[in-house]
């Protein structure tokens, strides 16, 4: 993904404020609530029977933190997202059989979470930069499918 200097600054400045544990759990939790069919990949996480159960589930929170840690890896490797996510792409494609559109959904949910937590900093320009990034990450994660 190609981000201009200003876009890189916008993304990294906001990322520096992110609490990975808190926002990761919220992003993954929202994905599971808003798109309930994605829960089938997380049956081992226990109770996902309601929005409250999902959002309070410690396994959802822990896995969400792992997901956002991977987004942090993307920020360090903007010039090689496909390489950065090659193993995760293979895992999600070959073993988990995740619909690659779910990567786009997660990216869009992450943008909602960021806008909610950092509304003063989340200008249209910042949103556009983040949209570019999450689209690039989703494409890299879906690479094994192509």
Swiss-Prot record:
It comes from the Eukaryota. GO terms for biological process: cellular oxidant detoxification; hydrogen peroxide catabolic process. Heme b binds at residues 63, 92. InterPro entries: Globin, Globin-like_sf, Globin/Proto, Hemoglobin_b, Hemoglobin_oxygen_transport. The modification Phosphothreonine is found at residue 12. Residues 2-146 form the Globin domain. Red blood cells. The modification S-nitrosocysteine is found at residue 93. GO terms for cellular component: haptoglobin-hemoglobin complex; hemoglobin complex. The modification N6-acetyllysine is found at residues 59, 82, 144. GO terms for molecular function: heme binding; metal ion binding; oxygen binding; oxygen carrier activity. The modification N-acetylvaline is found at residue 1. CDD domains: Hb-beta-like. Keywords: Acetylation, Heme, Iron, Metal-binding, Oxygen transport, Phosphoprotein, S-nitrosylation, Transport. Involved in oxygen transport from the lung to the various peripheral tissues. Belongs to the globin family. Heterotetramer of two alpha chains and two beta chains. This is Hemoglobin subunit beta.
